[in-house]
Amino acid sequence: MCIRDRAGVVDAVGGNTLANACAQTRYGGVVTACGLAESAALPATVMPFILRGVVLRGVDSVMAPSGPRLAAWARLARDMDLERLETMITEIGLSDVNGVAPDVLAGKVTGRLLVDVNR
């Protein structure tokens, strides 16, 4: 995907990943931040916000009222293509983690890894 090609981004990592998402979002795009796994810091400039009108919107997953939360889950259940979701997830066993870690660190893994701690 080309730089400044994204209309919207959902980021659950924070830090440099969130800063890069803002930098790569097109004019009028929206970036949502819902996690800080990498860092709570935002090492970015205000350029995407000023020059392209990018919006950074926080997602409250802790204190959000139950009404909107239930509505969001209902919409996901209705609209999510489960076959597409399954293509984004690779299940590995806990015993596989050390072998997969170098690929994760090298950026060779796409999607999400689901670790089965019983394997």
What do the PLM-derived regions correspond to, one by one?
Residues 70-119:
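C-terminal hydrophobic helical "lid"/dimerization subdomain
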Residues 13:
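Conserved NAD(P)H cofactor-binding loop of Rossmann-fold oxidoreductase domains
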Residues 1-3:
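Short, small-residue-biased leader/transition segments that mark boundaries at the very start
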Residues 16-82, 117-119:
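Glycine-rich phosphate-binding loop and adjacent beta-alpha segment
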Residues 7-10:
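N-terminal Rossmann-like NAD(P) cofactor-binding module of classical short-chain dehydrogenase/reductase
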